[in-house]
Amino acid sequence: MIPRYSRPEMVAIWSPETKFRIWFEIEAYAGEALAELGVIPKEAAKTIWEKGDAAKFDVARIDEIEAVTKHDVIAFLTHLAEFIGPDSRFVHQGMTSSDVLDTTLNVQLVRAADLLLADMDRVLAALKKRAFEHKDTVRIGRSHGIHAEPTTMGLTFARFYAEMERNRARLVAARAEIATGAVSGAVGTFANIDPRVEEYVCEKLGLEAEPVSTQVIPRDRHAMFFATLGVIASSIENVAIEIRHMQRTEVLEAEEFFSPGQKGSSAMPHKRNPVLTENLTGLARLVRMSVVPAMENVALWHERDISHSSVERAIGPDTTITLDFALNRLAGVVEKLVIYPENMLKNMNKFRGLVHSQRVLLALTQAGVSREDSYRLVQRNAMKVWEQGADFLEELLGDAEVRAALSEEQIREKFDLGYHTKHVDTIFKRVFG
């Protein structure tokens, strides 16, 4: 991912230096286990650890060797041998390249998941804070983009919080799904390496041993992981789209923080655009791009092929780096989001009471009018508001058929905003406990 949408904490997980360090640790831990089993000398295992641990792996040198070998793991092992010396013959005993590559990828994905979980905690904290801050800030709810009935800004934040909380649980499950390693040798049969080596290496790396690998770790695990990241990205976009609509000039119920010195347009000095949430909408697309390729990686030939490899070399870093950046950007947007309660009330009153139409409809049915006739009466008066700019309450009070069923007091009572928010505390208790 380009530096513009990257944070150093996540980039470091995918650096060549980090990758080669994990490669070395897998080889060194395997050497320790093999030494305990009497397969290689204990002094050799000690030498591998000491000399390899002190080495500063030269990425350029490894690339130079790979240019000849056309094999990245062999290039690394050749470079490692330059540090270790004669005992390097005991490195990679009974192992295959996938033991190193697949286990390393999963270590990196686990570390990435841990960072993403911390990011989500920041987003959740921001959403919760703003939810309680605006628990009773009334705004119009919209369906199909059209005024529906009153809700509160706090409930808007609360539903995003609940969605992100579900996503966090999904990511915890996806992390567990991906936290496996394999050191099972060619075609995964342990023919030339003891299963206890795999168990030891995985324990040291904080992984579970893959129950059955076929030289590679099954890619359904990775498919679930990246699918989860795609869902999280969609939830980010869900929040971003809401904010973008709320910042429209004719709505202006909320606005991204506009910092001193910020410019909105090279041509129009007056512009204050929702650029951060627009950016988040685009970044969500990039994250979701990884989902289908990850699923297509599940079907491999027989015990293995490398059709998955080129895909994962790209989507592993790009997707996690992008999502990490997006989550932190979203948290910042929510934390600094400017809310305009007065505009919310102004917008809600724009159609002069139409938002109370359902209450009038229900009152008529409860007064003995058929649902069909009740709907006709309410809609007839509502259309006068839409088409003539009339006042809904006044039209109802002047409608003889409506007044035959409902008194003035009964009609006026149906225009109480508090009626629509009376269960906000109940919903908050469900969401926040």
What are these regions (language model features)?
Residues 198-291:
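Acidic, glycine-rich loop-and-beta core segments that form the ion-binding/anion-interacting portion
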Residues 155, 223-231, 359-367:
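Short, well-ordered beta-strand elements within core beta-sheets of diverse protein domains
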Residues 133-136, 170-173, 177, 207-211, ...:
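Conserved helix-loop functional segments at active or binding sites
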Residues 110-121, 128, 158-161, 165, ...:
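Short amphipathic alpha-helical segments with heptad-repeat character
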Residues 33, 79, 83, 126, ...:
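Generic, well-ordered alpha-helical scaffold segments in large soluble proteins
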Residues 1-18, 55, 66-68, 75, ...:
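Catalytic-core signal marking the mid-to-C-terminal active-site face
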Residues 189, 204, 209-216, 345, ...:
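A structural signal for small-residue-enriched, beta-sheet-centric alpha/beta enzyme cores
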Residues 1-184, 190, 194-200, 209, ...:
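A helix-coil-helix interface module used to build multimeric assemblies
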